[in-house]
């Protein structure tokens, strides 16, 4: 996601977009889980740590905009989580987003595409033990081919999905053409990954 425009993958900044930026609604985030998350308030995510990138940030809750897209954090240093989606450690994918850059330089998820298989991601939860994940794969998708069904998955195995913008920046449209998507799975308790 860019500070200029974080459009396309259903992840874009809700305000201060360039007037000429196109705002396609290509991958809507489902409006679900509100009551479930309220019931599990003690397990809500509080911080994310990605040691490989030197990230240790508070998580801010994000909502779905009127056009169906997931809003982006207001500040370029913030990391946000989809508050109406699955919680980290629960069935389905918890979705976390951050900006790749701003008009003044790199932002919090600038290095996201450099993550390697096996890198660890830790999500601290309120009143619960941390949810630990390991990176399975890093993929890049054109905005028009964003895999919404894979990303915004409810049910099934627990997962964590990290998203930012990537690829070439289209100055005329005011947005990046691709999204970087990191898919991560829970760290097995007896795995050597737990200490990585």
Where in the sequence are the language-model features?
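Solvent-exposed, non-transmembrane regions of membrane-associated and secreted proteins
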Residues: 2-117, 122-196
